[in-house]
Amino acid sequence: MGIFDKFNIEVYNQLVERTKINGEASNMKKKLITALLATSVMSTMFSGCSVSTSTGSTATTDTSTKTESKTTDEATGEEVEITWLFWDDLEATEDLITIGYKQVIDRFNEEYKGKYHVKAITTNLAEYPAKLNALVAAGDVPDVFTCDPGPMLTQYVEAGATADLTDILQNQESEWYGTFSDGIFERLTYDGKIMAVPTCFAAACVFYNTEIFKEVGVEVPETYDQLIDVCKKIKEAGYAPISCSAGTAWCLGMIGGYLCDREGGPDNLKGINDGTLDWTSETFINAGKKLKELSQYFQESAAGDANDIATAHFYNGEAAMLVQGSWAIGQINGSNPAFEEKCGVFRFPGIEGGADPNRMIVKTDNLCMSSKTEHPEACIALMKMFTDDTSEKYIAEVGGKIPVTNVEFDVNKAPKQLSFIQDILSKTTGTLGFYNESLINTEAGDTFNNACVDIFLGTATPEEAFQKIQDHYDKKVRNK
């Protein structure tokens, strides 16, 4: 089952309108934009594996318990414990967003001491989907868990693992619901039912080292051809032009997705999803050829580097550019605070003769509540704290991501990179999700990401790699 959800960049503009700079509203020029965000639903399950936690094993919930029911512990006045599953280590991290989430957990446990207590279960991002899937398959769904929009969320909605939050938000907690930016629940709604709560919003851009650019004597590229020219000059100067993780396939897939969109725009995704366009079409082959050309300017260790390592190459000054989401700001500034002053941001370049170059890859981070939790009141209290003014101000002023509520924050306190991203978004004409998250299901998305890796490694030509995706669609998508 595939759907196209509308995402309105007016959400972002409303947020900026409420932002305060030294007590005054931002005078940034804003453009109202409505864009089609192609997402996909339905997915296959990942292979299961055992759970690694930071505080012990997960608490098993009674899968027959309804979300709306009161709990025995609450009825007797005893402190109840809930679990929250997250994709980073709350104790060892330097990522500023994760540090902020840890503060939420600590604040929650202190404020609700004697009534509620949340136990965080953590893993790394690469293992997170499989571990969450294993818990869902075992009937041990955490009371609250973090989830991406698109196929990842859809699979848990269709499995009945996530609670319908519509009545809670629109009726029981209408004041809380009213704090969110208009339209922010679009990608989290299924058949009119809200299945998750967003915590922050981010956009994928190109981060660059301004000192290296100045040293080499290059300007920010606006087109793909200019980007290649910049890469050549930076490589000649002895730096890695771009740091990228091919070891984390979605990172390479994000670049591949941008190239596909810059070649054919929203028509590419629409055509693939409605069956009127094949992956072997010239628009995709051209994108694959550009991915291969661009990849020769990645760091030498790109094939094996995980995402965190690739990001470290950038903020340690070894690479001049990093294609990543604004979620990376927290990691960059948290790991190397001094780097903030030399970190610029620009939009992924357009292709001359191609499609609209002003479209952006965007996403939200989200919280889901288990449909079988025995403690819905505690879960909602936690989700509310994740999105209260204290948390949302931290998201912007420290973490550099965009709040999902109408909170007013001081841009002067926020990381410099956030203002650059605000400027880019103010000129954005449309949005899309990650390419792999915009296809029919997770298996199709994985096939796309793996094709991008094959092109980079040279194990397949662009024609061969995209033929593999087409073969997958012919056998498992369109031949059903």
Where are these regions (language model features)?
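Conserved N-terminal structural module of periplasmic/extracytoplasmic solute-binding proteins
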Residues: 4, 12, 20, 34-35, ...
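Extracytoplasmic/periplasmic substrate-recognition and gating elements
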Residues: 80, 107-114, 215-216, 289, ...
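Hinge/lid segment of periplasmic solute-binding proteins
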Residues: 124, 148-205, 219, 228, ...
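A structural signal for short loop-to-beta-strand junctions that line the ligand-binding cleft
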Residues: 135, 142-143, 173-212, 240-244, ...
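Short, solvent-exposed loop/beta-turn-alpha elements that line the ligand-binding surface or hinge
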Residues: 166-180, 263-286, 334-338, 350-358, ...
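C-terminal capping/gating helix-and-loop segments adjacent to ligand/active sites or protein-protein/ligand interfaces
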Residues: 189, 361, 401-407, 420-474
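Extracytoplasmic/periplasmic solute-binding protein
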Residues: 190-199, 204, 228-276, 319
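Glycine-centered hinge/linker elements that transmit conformational signals in sensory
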Residues: 231-233, 273-303
